[in-house]
């Protein structure tokens, strides 16, 4: 019988994932009992145990239930204190045609840093421009879980990375986002999770001027101190907003959100 470490959550928990994608991953496996756990798409907070059977993939809902003062995980008529105990139980008991044997193999996806990211939260994974990371999970649109070459795992902001392949070198790193002057194409990040998850519209102050390409009529011209009304934060790093009555896009590296109206300039415009 195959064995696996139930305490290694990253090996079996695939995070947000569609039923179709889970089926595709498991149907590429040849043996019964290969499985993964994903988030439920219909009930927030619940999970789905997806298992490769003989000729199909079965999906078993795992309900996260509050019982008195504790949380239990219920699958069918069985309840468990946590997910590792649930998985251990089904390595010894059949679900339909098979017990659990091992987690599904992940598609190895690598990314490379476009900027330095120093991180601001305990869960962040700092990295440098040009550093290669392996994606563990795509938790949110703008924040993913990744692992570095030392094996450390943490959260990274999607706008700071791009897809990587083994043939890339530093010259292939996207240079569409201008760097801070004098920093050798390295952007010292103070980006916070709240920046990318901020309720929009929100206001941001320009911290680096920018003169856009004359042929790009949708790009905003930025002057230090300008206040932009940010209307959209795209994962490619080109945000959208309104400045001086014009709507357009601008690189997120050139602005920082403001949290109050205590500004010597433009305060009457944004309060």
Swiss-Prot record:
Tissue note: Embryonic zygotic expression is seen in invaginating presumptive mesoderm and ectodermally derived tissues during gastrulation. At stage 8, expression is also seen in anterior and posterior midgut and cephalic furrow. By stage 9, expression is highest in visceral mesoderm of anterior and posterior midgut, ventral nerve cord and somatic mesoderm.
Alphabetical list of InterPro entries matching this protein: CRK_SH3_C, CRK_SH3_N, SH2, SH2_dom_sf, SH3-like_dom_sf, SH3_domain, Tyrosine-phos_adapter
Keyword RNA-binding: no
UniProt keywords, alphabetically: Developmental protein, Repeat, SH2 domain, SH3 domain
Cited Pfam families: SH2, SH3_1, SH3_2
This protein's GO CC annotations: cytoplasm
PANTHER family referenced in this protein's UniProt entry, alphabetically: CRK-LIKE PROTEIN (PTHR19969:SF5), SH2-SH3 ADAPTOR PROTEIN-RELATED (PTHR19969)
UniProt family annotation: Belongs to the CRK family.
The protein's name: Adapter molecule Crk
Encoding gene, per UniProt annotation: Crk
